[in-house]
From Swiss-Prot:
HAMAP family: LpxC. GO terms for molecular function: metal ion binding; UDP-3-O-acyl-N-acetylglucosamine deacetylase activity. It comes from the Bacteria. Keywords: Hydrolase, Lipid A biosynthesis, Lipid biosynthesis, Lipid metabolism, Metal-binding, Zinc. Its cofactor is Zn(2+). This is UDP-3-O-acyl-N-acetylglucosamine deacetylase. Disulfide bonds: none annotated. The keyword Membrane does not apply. The lineage of its organism: Bacteria, Pseudomonadati, Pseudomonadota, Gammaproteobacteria, Lysobacterales. It comes from Xanthomonas euvesicatoria pv. vesicatoria (strain 85-10). GO terms for biological process: lipid A biosynthetic process.
Length: 303
């Protein structure tokens, strides 16, 4: 039996948006069963709600952004990843600005926030999206694919012509569970190259970026004094992003995901392609007295 989950208590955080550079106040609130993840722009009059829905994705350049009723919510992927990692189904995310705080560039601070708020089980079974048929999308040599699998596993391969990202450190696989997510994925930070800085600034991107919230590389090395948290932190962060992007499907995935040089745009294209093909997936749940789901979530954390 795996039940839906929400937060036990309301919790708040503040930070800056990675791309906007704006200070933002964020409040995470409990939500009822079947509510899902809903963002709320409390700085707007009237307040606008934006569901965490792959069909509302309008921005995929260096982040995943949603738009609903004229209101934007930018850089949702790291919080969505943490929610997926801890199995939180229902939550209200109030924001005082259009972009979520970047924190340290990983999902670790969001994991800590969620655990600090406490996570409680609710009265209805959790709903999973079970992959029944292979679905694949491509963009040039980039590939993102879902395949049937008993559980949830993710594999990712990146290709960067950089001495700090050799081929042997460009591949990562994870058999998803809360424990594996927290230990192996959640601390991996977003990264960027000095050579791309001008391109980003011209487009008003990365304005809040610094070595406090990203790994920064020049042509030869990592510039952060503390170095890397994992030897292959770069590809692990790509899995972190993918877990967040895929959670916009509206439920936890049961299947195998494979990404080759994929990013936010292709991940979103994959989710949309899946949802559009009704023969390729089904809703499943595991009510009391039935089989256990093939994915392990940590016991609820009662704060």
């Amino acid at each position: 039996m795996t039940q839906q989950r929400t937060l036990k208590n309301t919790i708040r955080a503040t930070g800056v948006g990675l791309h906007s550079g704006d200070k933002v106040y964020m409040t995470l609130r409990p939500a009822p069963v079947d509510h899902g993840v809903v963002f709320r722009r409390v700085d707007l009059e009237p307040v606008v709600e934006v569901p965490a829905d792959a069909e509302l994705v309008t921005e995929t350049t260096l982040c995943t952004g949603l738009t609903c009723n004229g209101a934007k919510i930018q850089t949702v992927e790291h919080l969505m990843s943490a929610l997926a990692g801890l199995g939180v189904d229902n939550v209200i995310v109030e924001l005082s600005s259009a972009e979520l705080p970047i924190m340290d560039g990983s999902s670790g601070p969001f994991v800590f926030l969620l655990q600090s708020a406490g996570i409680v089980e609710q009265s209805k079974p959790k709903r999973f999206i079970r992959i029944k048929q292979t679905v694949e999308v491509r963009d040039g040599d980039k590939v993102a694919r879902f395949e049937p699998y008993e559980g949830y596993k993710l594999g990712f391969t990146i290709e960067f012509n950089h001495p700090m990202i050799p081929a042997k450190q460009s591949r990562q696989e994870i058999e998803f569970s809360t424990s594996a997510y927290v230990k192996e994925i959640s601390r991996a930070r977003t990264f960027g190259f000095m050579r791309d800085l001008e391109y980003m600034r011209e487009r008003n991107l990365g304005l809040g970026g610094s070595m406090d919230n990203a790994i920064v590389l020049d042509e030869f090395r990592v510039l952060n004094e503390d170095g890397l948290r994992y030897t292959n932190e770069f590809v692990r962060h790509k899995i972190l992003d993918a877990i967040g992007d895929l959670y916009l499907a509206g439920g936890a995935i049961l299947g195998a995901y494979e990404g080759f040089k994929s990013g936010h745009a292709l991940n979103n294209k994959l989710v949309r392609a899946l949802l559009a093909d009704q023969a390729a997936w089904e809703w499943v749940s595991f009510p009391e007295g039935t089989e256990q789901p093939p994915v392990t979530y940590a016991s609820p954390v009662y704060a």
